[in-house]
From Swiss-Prot:
The presence of a 'disulfide through disulfide knot' structurally defines this protein as a knottin. This is Nemertide alpha-3. The modification 4-hydroxyproline is found at residues 28-29. It is found in: Secreted. It comes from Lineus lacteus. The lineage of its organism: Eukaryota, Metazoa, Spiralia, Lophotrochozoa, Nemertea. Belongs to the nemertide family. One of its GO terms (cellular component) is extracellular region. Disulfide bonds join 2-16, 9-20, 15-26. Keywords: Disulfide bond, Hydroxylation, Ion channel impairing toxin, Knottin, Neurotoxin, Secreted, Toxin, Voltage-gated sodium channel impairing toxin. Toxin with similar potency against both insect and mammalian sodium channels (Nav). It inhibits inactivation of most Nav tested (B.germanica (BgNav1); EC(50)=97.5 nM, human Nav1.1/SCN1A; EC(50)=125.8 nM, rat Nav1.2/SCN2A; EC(50)=137.8 nM, rat Nav1.3/SCN3A; EC(50)=138.9 nM, rat Nav1.4/SCN4A; EC(50)=150.2 nM, human Nav1.5/SCN5A; EC(50)=108.4 nM, mouse Nav1.6/SCN8A; EC(50)=92.8 nM, human Nav1.9/SCN9A; EC(50)=102.2 nM). Inactivation is completely prevented by a concentration of 1 uM, resulting in sustained, non-inactivating current. One of its GO terms (molecular function) is toxin activity.
Amino acid sequence: GCIKTGSGCTLSKGCCTKNCGWNFKCNPPNQ
């Protein structure tokens, strides 16, 4: 699942999945 960019990531990093606490894993938009 991906959350909208801006929650700890920039647009260039695609989408992010919430990992743990304040940490976010950023993945390319195609994942």
